[in-house]
Amino acid sequence: MILATKVFFTSFVFGFILFPYFIKLLKKISKDGQPIRSCGPESHLITKKNVPPMGGIIILTSSLLPILLWVQLTPEILLLILITLFFALLGFIDDYLKLKTNHYRGLSAKTKILIQFIVALVGVFILKLYSAECFTKTSLFKGVIIDFGYLYVPFAAFVIVGSSNAVNLTDGLDGLAATQVITSFAFLGLIAYITQADMNITLFCIAFIGAILSFLWFNTHPAKIFMGDVGSLSVGAALGLTSVLIKREMLFAVIGIIFVIETLSVIIQISYFKYTKFKYGEGKRVFLMAPMHHHFEKKGWSENVIVMKFWIISIICSVFTITFLL
């Protein structure tokens, strides 16, 4: 408990101190802030203007400091750190290109996903090298075990990449991604503790909770900084790999239900638009706008209302998971 407290407060305090200086630095470097989509909600062109991205740099710095200081660097923790940093580098390049071109598009989606899958597959193969014979097995719920066999490697890679991009899609409102990530880390860390999977993984989760809470202080509406792709892609990958390491990938889908809904809303919207355009010559939409949080914005909901209601949903689903499915 004392060690967990050290990890939490080290990451939180370190982030809380660094963020104000980092925000000032970013505003000097990029006066225009993160490029905003002109096709997005009209209010964002005003409320998101001149807000700098790349807050994920401080999130990672604040998280990794206590991990390196207080957490035992087991192969699992080292793998978590490496995968997180690789995805952070990809996100940093994406953010940099957006700022350089002053356009909301950075790396192409195909390029990002290809690199993500390569990194994830390499990470899972490394995990396989030092894992036990039960490597291909995962827990569904209440002791129900599924053996994926040879399919587990691509499945685990899909979880990591899917989680990374789901957090990225969710990061569209002030405080939305941060609150969802905090909940996911909290309950995945709790599962690791309850199941005695690995106390070091619990400490890893606690470090990120502290760092993201310090970020949330400056990211609540109206946000002073965004986490950027360097934050969302890396944090999402860390969540996905954490669920893989504790063998609770399926439960993570329930805990991170908002991530799932946000991702599905985009897939449904794009698929239906392409289908109707092909069949009728004119594309139609299921939602007013995707991801889902923009749909509710279009219906007149305020950012704070959407963020809080989505957070309530994720907490309820997480408590349900711990109570009835674990």
UniProtKB/Swiss-Prot annotation:
GO CC terms for this protein?
plasma membrane
Q: Name the InterPro entries on file.
A: Glycosyl_transferase_4 (IPR000715), PNAcMuramoyl-5peptid_Trfase (IPR003524), PNAcMuramoyl-5peptid_Trfase_CS (IPR018480)
Give the record's membrane topology: Multi-pass membrane protein
MF GO annotations: metal ion binding; phospho-N-acetylmuramoyl-pentapeptide-transferase activity; UDP-N-acetylmuramoyl-L-alanyl-D-glutamyl-meso-2,6-diaminopimelyl-D-alanyl-D-alanine:undecaprenyl-phosphate transferase activity
- The EC class name is transferase
> HAMAP family from the entry?
MraY (MF_00038)
Role: Catalyzes the initial step of the lipid cycle reactions in the biosynthesis of the cell wall peptidoglycan: transfers peptidoglycan precursor phospho-MurNAc-pentapeptide from UDP-MurNAc-pentapeptide onto the lipid carrier undecaprenyl phosphate, yielding undecaprenyl-pyrophosphoryl-MurNAc-pentapeptide, known as lipid I.
Q: Quote the NCBIfam families the UniProt record gives.
A: mraY (TIGR00445)
Q: What is this protein called?
A: Phospho-N-acetylmuramoyl-pentapeptide-transferase
